Regions:
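Short, charged beta->alpha transition segments
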Residues: 1-6, 26-30
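Beta-strand-turn-beta hairpins that frame and shape the catalytic cleft
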Residues: 2-17
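CN hydrolase (nitrilase-like) catalytic-core segments centered on the catalytic cysteine
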Residues: 13-16, 20-129
Length: 130
């Protein structure tokens, strides 16, 4: 697992956490990152595409931040999801194996630093430290 802080954003720096797919299944790790990172990246080389799609769907709400999973073109199954209303939740989704794909999209992780974001945060969520 890696956590880096970048001078991106108008008011606060952006903290990005990254892990490989196996480490992402460690719920203690994910719980620890909940208040520390603003975006979570997952690198995968995984055949079990459906399980990791479902995991990203759960993690972006649990962590209350954008979660991006990039899987190998050999297996497909890359996705980017943010905790927004249902019609805005899926930023990118690529399925199918043996293909190369590039998705370009914009994600603003600063939306989720406070409790006044577009989607209701978790119960008891007080925002991330700035």
């Amino acid at each position: 697992m890696t956590l880096i802080e970048l001078p991106i954003g108008t008011k606060w720096n952006t903290r990005i956490a990254a892990a490989i797919c196996y480490d992402t299944t460690n719920l203690d790790l994910v719980a620890d990152l909940h208040g520390r990172s603003d975006m979570f990246l997952v690198a995968a080389l995984n055949q079990d595409v459906q399980t990791f799609d479902n995991m990203v769907a759960a993690l972006h709400f649990r962590m209350y931040q954008p979660v991006l999973l990039t899987n190998s073109g050999e297996f497909g199954g890359s996705t980017a999801q943010v905790p927004l209303p249902k019609h805005e939740r899926l930023s990118a989704h690529v399925h199918g194996n043996q293909q190369d794909a590039v998705s370009v999209f914009e994600v603003d992780p600063s939306l989720f630093k406070s409790i006044s974001a577009a989607k209701a945060p978790l119960a008891g969520y007080k925002g991330r430290p700035r």
